[in-house]
């Protein structure tokens, strides 16, 4: 109520000073400034949304974690296409070669075992005389020595004769016979005798058919039947 008379008063003052202006016009141009005391603080507003600053640099990688558990096996894949037919001939050749190698190894092993059985031996000059002390007919002695890559022991001098005597220690076949020509003793390796050490009155072909020769325990020779069994002594190059 006090504000309206005050405004009117201000208008009157303005009119009297302006002259030709009407009060109504003056009213429109008057400014009213009211200067009061500061009001009380209003209520606290709601919490705003969090702000977003600039993106920082990427940090270093962390430590390697423990291995995970083994996963379940995957499903079986599709069946593959049928392969090409193999070369059966090449396989047969390989098998044949393997079989030949096995047979060779067997032969070498058997030879080694038989040589090992000849536990006694003696060297004389360029020869080595060995025995297994097994007694057998002359034909088997020849076969055994041949299988061992040797020959039946043949003394060609007194030294070799003594070596065979010491190895055999009993009667043993020598590689000497007259099977080809009666009374003409030859080496089984070929050639006529160049050394002999016959007992007295030997060879006598007693009862006929004594075509082989043995050395007895005193080192002397005796003609004997080839079917009789005597110790096998073989010789090898030393």
Swiss-Prot record:
Region of interest: Calcium-dependent carbohydrate binding: 202-210
Name of the protein this chain belongs to: Mannose-binding protein A
Effect of residue 45 to D: Disrupts homotrimer formation. 5-fold reduction in secretion rate. Prevents K-47 hydroxylation and glycosylation
Compartments (UniProt record): Secreted
Annotated positions of the 5-hydroxylysine modification: 44, 47, 79, 82
Annotated disulfide bonds: 145-234, 212-226
Region of interest (Disordered), ranges: 38-87
Gene: Mbl1
Binding site for Ca(2+) 2: 202, 204, 210, 222-223
